[in-house]
């Protein structure tokens, strides 16, 4: 009895490119910053994220044609936006910690999220660049 199936790297990249071509470039997604200390999980809902509420902050539309598919590395393929979205809120008086970003689809539903390795501080005259990405892998533990 087989313990599980694994896709070879070449096929994995083909599948990731197909996902990108058939789904990501045909749908609108928005990227949002979140300010609560939360590590994303597969069971998350929008209620798990507290969106940034700084004056001048707004979620940003991801560019449909901006996705690129990298070569496989460690049995995973990274699909990411080529150009980062820059968040530059106005009127900041107190530095704010930003823990990561989440992405919503056209219906406003949570699509995916990523926590930053370390929380980023946004203060007076500062901004945060976010390059949205999806890790397309053989298995969740890969």
What are these regions (language model features)?
Residues 1-99, 105-142:
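Small cysteine-rich, disulfide-bonded extracellular modules of the LU/uPAR three-finger superfamily
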């Amino acid at each position: 009895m087989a313990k599980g199936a694994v896709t070879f790297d070449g096929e994995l990249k083909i599948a990731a490119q197909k996902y990108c071509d058939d789904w990501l470039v045909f749908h609108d997604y928005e990227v949002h910053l979140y300010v609560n200390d939360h590590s994303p999980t597969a069971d998350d809902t929008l209620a798990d994220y507290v969106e940034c509420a700084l004056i001048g902050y707004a979620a940003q539309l991801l560019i449909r044609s901006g996705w690129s598919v990298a070569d496989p590395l460690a049995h995973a393929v990274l699909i990411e936006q080529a150009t980062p979205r820059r968040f530059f809120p106005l009127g900041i008086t107190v530095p704010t910690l930003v823990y990561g970003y989440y992405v919503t689809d056209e219906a406003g539903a949570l699509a995916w999220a990523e926590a930053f390795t370390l929380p980023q501080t946004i203060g007076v005259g500062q901004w945060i660049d976010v390059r949205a990405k999806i890790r397309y892998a053989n298995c969740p533990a890969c």
